[in-house]
C-alpha cells in the first residue's frame, strides 16, 4: 500500500504522516507519534513531542528507543533547538563521553532564550535534572546537592496542574542524589532520600525506578550496621522485581541490583551464587552503564577471587577497579588500594605491598581497616609482635575512623589477624580467645569471607570443637575454605505440569518477604489473582509451604540457587 501511495499520490504522504502523528499523540503513544512526525519531516513537532516524553521513556527502561529517535533527527537540529540539545545530553549520559554530554548542556543553556516562554519552566527543570544525573554518574556529592537544589527550585516554579506529572522526575532526582550520598559515605541522608524515592515509585506504579531505590537501600542497610539478613532481603526484592518485569539484565537498574546482591553473597561465602550474579551484571554493563556500577562489579570480582584463593585474578580485578577510580569523584568511598596491599601480602610479595601502602594517607593507614592492612604485611614479614601492637587500638575500640563499607568486616578481620599473630607467638590461649570472639561476631550474620583473607586455616582446624559454641559455623567455614560446593539433592524430577508465564512471575517473588497483596501490587494484578497463582504453583511444585516451593523452584532452575541451610 505504501508503494502504491508513493506511485499514485506522493504529495499526500507527509500529510498522512502528520495526521498519524496527531492521532498517536492524542492517544498517548509518543514513540509512534514521533516516528510519524519525523517521517513527515516535521522536525519542530517531532522535537516537542520527544522532549516532552524522553524522561518518561528513560524511566521505563527505554533508553535505546530514545537514542534511536534522536538519531533520526538531522545532525544540525540541536544547534537551533535547545530542548533537543538537552535531550541529547540526557541520552548521552550512559553512552557518550562526559565532554560530549557537557557540550550539549552548554549548547542548550546558551540557546535558552530560544525556548518559548510557556515551555521555559519545564526546560529549566530538564537542564537541572540532566546536571543532577551527570553529577550522579561521577559520584560528585557537592555537584549533586547543588543540582538537587536547582531541581527543587525548578519544580517549585512549575504550574500547579503540572506537578502530578512530575512525580516520576522527582523519584529519579531523589534516587540519584541518594545514590551519590550512599557511595560518598553520607548514609543517613542517602537512606532518607532513597526511602522517599521508593515510596513515591510504588505510589505512582513505577517499578523500574523502585528497583534502583530498593537495591541501594540494601547496600545502605549494611553500611548502617543493620543485619545482613535485612540487606539481603532488600536486594533479593530488587532482583525479584527486576526479574518479574524482564529488567534483570538492564544495565542501569538491573545490573546494580545483581552486582550488589552478588557482593553481599561473597561476604557470606556463597561464592557460586555470587559469581552467577556478577557474571550477569558484567554482561549487562557490556552494553552501557555507569562507571560507579562498573566499579562495584570489578570490586566484587576482586573480593570473590580473593575469597576463593585465586590471588592473581583478585589482583587483576582490583587493579581494574583502580583504573576506573579516577573517572569518579574523589568522594567515592570504594577504594581498592587496601585490598591490593592485602593480596600482595598474602602472595608473600611484601615489596609491592609496601609500595601500595605508601600511597595511602597517614589518616587512611591509621584507620581501622588501614591498621588491618598494615597487620597483614607485618604478618607476611614474620613480625607477629608488631601485628598485635598495630591491631590493639582496633580490637580495643580506640581506633574509630572507618575506611570500609562495613565496620563489622573491619572488626572480624582485625581479630583474625590478631589470632594468627598470637598463634605464631605460641600464645595458644590468646589465639583461641581471639578466634572464639571472631566466630561469635561472624555467626550472628553468617559472615565467612574474612576467614579466607587471613592465614588462619590451620588455626581453625585445630580449634577444639568441644570448646567452641560455634561448631556449626566453624565446619561451614572450613568447607568454604576447602572449596566445597553445596551438597546437591540430586537430579530434580521434571514438572508434569509446566508453570505458566504468569505463575513464573509470581515464583520470582517467593524468595522475598513480600506477602500476596504486596506481590500483587508489584505485578499490578489483584491479590486474589496472586493467591490463585500460589495455589497452582504449590500444586505443580508438590510443595506444602512457601519455603518448599522456593527450594523446589531452585532445584528446577526456575530461581537462582539459595543459601545452603
Residue positions per predicted region:
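Extended alpha-helical scaffolding segments used for macromolecular assembly and cargo binding
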Residues: 3-91, 95, 100, 104, ...
Amino acid at each position: 500500500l505504501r508503494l502504491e501511495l508513493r506511485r499514485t499520490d506522493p504529495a499526500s504522504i507527509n500529510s498522512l504522516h502528520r495526521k498519524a502523528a496527531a492521532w498517536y499523540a492524542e492517544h498517548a503513544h509518543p514513540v509512534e507519534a514521533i516516528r510519524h512526525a519525523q517521517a513527515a519531516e516535521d522536525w519542530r513537532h517531532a522535537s516537542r513531542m520527544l522532549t516532552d516524553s524522553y524522561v518518561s521513556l528513560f524511566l521505563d527502561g527505554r533508553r535505546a528507543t530514545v537514542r534511536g529517535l534522536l538519531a533520526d533527527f538531522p545532525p544540525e537540529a540541536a544547534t537551533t533547538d535547545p530542548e533537543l540539545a538537552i535531550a541529547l545530553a540526557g541520552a548521552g549520559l550512559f553512552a557518550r563521553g562526559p565532554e560530549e554530554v557537557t557540550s550539549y548542556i552548554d549548547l542548550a543553556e546558551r540557546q535558552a532564550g530560544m525556548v518559548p516562554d510557556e515551555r521555559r519552566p519545564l526546560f529549566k527543570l530538564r537542564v537541572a535534572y540532566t546536571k543532577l544525573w551527570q553529577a550522579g554518574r561521577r559520584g560528585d556529592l557537592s555537584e549533586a546537592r547543588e543540582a538537587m537544589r536547582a531541581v527543587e527550585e525548578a519544580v517549585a516554579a512549575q504550574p500547579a496542574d503540572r506537578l502530578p506529572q512530575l512525580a516520576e522526575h522527582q523519584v529519579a532526582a531523589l534516587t540519584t542524589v541518594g545514590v551519590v550520598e550512599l557511595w560518598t559515605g553520607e548514609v543517613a541522608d542517602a537512606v532518607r532520600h532513597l526511602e522517599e524515592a521508593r515510596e513515591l515509585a510504588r505510589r505512582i506504579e513505577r517499578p523500574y525506578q523502585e528497583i534502583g531505590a530498593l537495591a541501594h537501600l540494601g547496600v545502605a542497610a549494611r553500611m548502617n550496621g543493620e543485619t545482613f539478613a535485612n540487606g539481603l532481603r532488600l536486594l533479593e526484592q530488587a532482583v525479584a522485581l527486576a526479574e518479574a518485569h524482564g529488567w534483570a539484565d538492564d544495565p542501569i537498574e538491573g545490573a546494580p541490583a545483581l552486582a550488589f546482591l552478588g557482593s553481599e553473597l561473597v561476604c557470606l561465602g556463597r561464592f557460586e551464587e555470587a559469581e552467577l550474579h556478577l557474571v550477569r551484571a558484567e554482561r549487562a554493563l557490556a552494553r552501557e552503564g555507569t562507571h560507579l556500577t562498573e566499579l562495584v562489579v570489578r570490586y566484587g570480582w576482586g573480593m570473590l577471587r580473593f575469597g576463593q584463593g585465586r590471588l592473581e585474578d583478585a589482583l587483576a580485578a582490583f587493579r581494574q577497579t583502580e583504573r576506573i577510580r579516577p573517572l569518579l569523584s574523589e568522594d567515592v568511598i570504594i577504594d581498592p588500594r587496601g585490598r591490593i596491599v592485602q593480596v600482595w601480602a598474602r602472595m608473600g610479595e611484601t615489596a609491592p605491598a609496601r609500595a601500595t601502602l605508601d600511597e595511602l594517607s597517614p589518616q587512611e593507614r591509621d584507620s581501622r581497616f588501614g591498621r588491618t592492612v598494615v597487620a597483614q604485611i607485618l604478618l607476611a614479614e614474620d613480625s607477629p609482635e608488631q601485628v598485635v601492637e598495630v591491631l590493639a587500638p582496633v580490637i580495643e575500640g580506640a581506633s574509630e575512623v572507618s575506611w570500609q563499607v562495613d565496620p563489622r568486616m573491619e572488626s572480624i578481620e582485625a581479630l583474625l589477624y590478631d589470632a594468627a599473630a598470637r598463634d605464631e607467638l605460641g600464645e595458644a590461649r590468646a589465639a583461641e580467645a581471639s578466634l572464639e570472639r571472631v566466630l561469635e561476631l561472624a555467626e550472628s550474620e553468617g559472615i565467612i569471607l574474612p576467614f579466607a583473607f587471613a592465614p588462619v586455616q590451620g588455626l581453625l582446624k585445630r580449634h577444639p570443637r568441644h570448646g567452641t559454641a560455634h561448631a556449626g559455623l566453624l565446619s561451614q567455614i572450613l568447607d568454604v575454605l576447602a572449596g566445597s560446593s553445596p551438597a546437591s539433592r540430586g537430579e530434580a524430577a521434571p514438572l508434569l505440569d509446566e508453570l505458566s508465564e504468569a505463575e513464573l512471575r509470581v515464583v520470582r517473588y517467593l524468595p522475598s518477604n513480600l506477602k500476596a497483596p504486596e506481590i500483587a501490587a508489584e505485578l499490578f494484578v489483584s491479590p486474589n489473582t496472586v493467591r490463585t497463582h500460589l495455589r497452582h504453583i504449590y500444586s505443580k511444585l508438590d510443595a506444602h509451604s512457601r519455603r518448599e516451593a522456593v527450594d523446589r523452584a531452585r532445584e528446577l532452575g526456575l530461581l537462582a540457587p539459595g543459601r545452603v541451610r
